[in-house]
């Protein structure tokens, strides 16, 4: 029998072939993807918030990533956000730039959200397959407060921290806050009624962070004078069905007082990827704080603080399994690697000092003053392959016009044992000396 002729093929085979052809055609047209405009998620890209303090000039710096971790600017970069960054005309003042997650990507990597910290708005972009960005209609959107510094996605909602420490907007009578938005299908942000949680004046909230199931929100108030003078606090909230936030039992929770000053100030919250554990940098104590949390109530329990050999541990990240943990230590410009096999007792194994740190300047904190490097590291990000860590550095001394460099991006290599090295020089970021670039998103 000649089975190659269509008339001789069984009807079910013909039907199967036809259905397969339809599926292929739909896939080729992108019909199986989300509705935010991209046919496939971008890969091998990196984004930085320029935090440009000139009105209308804040932007997202976009790069493609090569196999060796090196970076090449994306076509069209920088991508304007429609707003301005915040201003910090000081020499390393605590507070204004103490923040985390000023930019976040959707889980499908097709949309990007970033703060305009100096114009009180949130920029929203669609991410094309090639990594280029296009603002969604109506972007940027009011942040419902002053000086937004941190954003987080929880399901179809976006939560924001408004810090209210932008020098160009002080003094004012508004309070810092945590607040929420509904993310509409086209990316627009709609404020959630009654979702705003005010923070005490000068409380300096730094971050908003969602649990794995999006049912809890965590935050850190860097200064929390209403909780306990001179000691920061952590917050946890349950996310209600309507998107409003309910304080968890014991929240806000003052950080544990130690035997000697200085008091602990919290920064750089990060969740263990598989267990109910929260990590926090105790900045002025040079310690890594370890907490557990109740998955239902959100209540936090302090476990311990482990030593960090750097100076002012500020940002924390783990790898995908949670077995490795990395911290950025701000004042001595170092990165620490911890063996996190026991996630309740991380053990520091290495500290690496970054390259090209610039001249020293006096960070004037009165009796606690010290010399600090000009190019000071801030937020880190691991790439998906876990072969590289990117660390952003800012020109931290804004009081000396002659010192114009310091805004850089460091590329660290991760060895098989988790230790890090810096084979090459950092990348100079194309921002003016007055800018304090911040935040990294890496696909």
Q: Which residues fall in each region the model found?
A:
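Short glycine/acidic-enriched loop and turn motifs that connect beta-strands
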Residues: 52-56, 119-121, 164-169, 223-227, ...
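Blade-level signature of beta-propeller repeat domains, shared across WD40, Kelch, NHL, RCC1
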Residues: 402-443
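Bacterial Sec-dependent N-terminal signal peptides
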Residues: 2-3, 16-44
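Asp-box/WD-like beta-propeller blade repeats and closely related beta-sheet repeat scaffolds
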Residues: 133-211
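Short loop/turn segments immediately following beta-strands, especially the blade-tip
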Residues: 63-71, 124-133, 180-189, 236-246, ...
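Beta-propeller fold detector
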Residues: 71-83, 133-142, 189-199, 245-255, ...
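Beta-rich, blade/repeat-based domains predominating
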Residues: 81-105, 142-155, 198-214, 255-277, ...
């Amino acid at each position: 029998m000649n089975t190659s002729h269509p008339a001789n093929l069984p009807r079910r085979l013909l039907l199967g072939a036809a259905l397969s052809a339809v599926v292929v055609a739909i896939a080729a047209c992108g019909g199986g993807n989300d509705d935010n405009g991209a046919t496939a998620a971008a890969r091998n890209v990196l984004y930085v918030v320029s935090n440009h303090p000139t009105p209308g000039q804040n932007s997202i710096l976009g790069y493609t990533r090569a196999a060796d971790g090196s970076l090449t600017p994306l076509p069209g970069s920088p991508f304007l956000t429609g707003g301005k960054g915040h201003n910090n005309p000081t020499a390393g003042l605590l507070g204004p730039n103490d923040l985390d997650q000023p930019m976040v990507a959707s889980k499908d990597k097709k949309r990007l959200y970033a703060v305009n910290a100096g114009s009180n708005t949130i920029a929203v972009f669609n991410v094309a397959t090639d990594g280029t960005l296009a603002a969604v209609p109506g972007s940027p959107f009011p942040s419902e407060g002053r000086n937004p510094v941190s954003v987080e996605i929880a399901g179809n909602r976006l939560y924001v921290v408004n810090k209210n420490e932008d020098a160009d907007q002080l003094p004012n009578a508004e309070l810092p806050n945590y607040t929420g938005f509904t993310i509409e299908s086209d990316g627009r942000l709609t404020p959630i009624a009654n979702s705003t949680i005010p923070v005490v004046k000068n409380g300096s909230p730094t971050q908003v962070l969602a649990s794995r199931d999006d049912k809890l929100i965590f935050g850190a108030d860097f200064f929390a004078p209403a909780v306990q003078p001179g000691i920061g606090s952590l917050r946890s909230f349950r996310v209600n069905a309507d998107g409003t936030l309910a304080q968890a039992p014991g929240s806000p929770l003052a950080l544990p007082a130690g035997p000697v000053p200085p008091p602990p100030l919290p920064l750089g919250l990060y969740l263990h990827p598989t267990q109910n554990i929260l990590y926090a940098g105790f900045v002025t104590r040079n310690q890594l704080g370890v907490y557990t949390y109740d998955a239902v109530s959100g209540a936090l329990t302090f476990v311990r603080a482990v030593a960090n050999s750097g100076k002012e541990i500020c940002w924390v990240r783990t790898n995908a399994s949670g077995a490795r943990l990395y911290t950025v230590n701000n004042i001595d410009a170092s990165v620490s690697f911890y063996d996190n096999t026991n996630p309740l007792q991380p053990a520091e194994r290495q500290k690496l000092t970054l390259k090209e740190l610039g001249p020293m300047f006096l960070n004037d904190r009165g009796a606690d003053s010290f010399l600090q490097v000009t190019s000071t590291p801030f937020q880190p990000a691991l790439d998906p392959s876990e072969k590289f860590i990117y660390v952003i550095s800012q020109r931290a001394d804004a009081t000396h016009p002659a010192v114009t460099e310091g805004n850089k991006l460091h590329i660290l290599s991760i060895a098989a044992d988790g230790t890090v090295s810096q084979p090459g020089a950092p990348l100079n970021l194309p921002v003016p000396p007055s800018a304090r670039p911040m935040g990294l998103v890496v696909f």
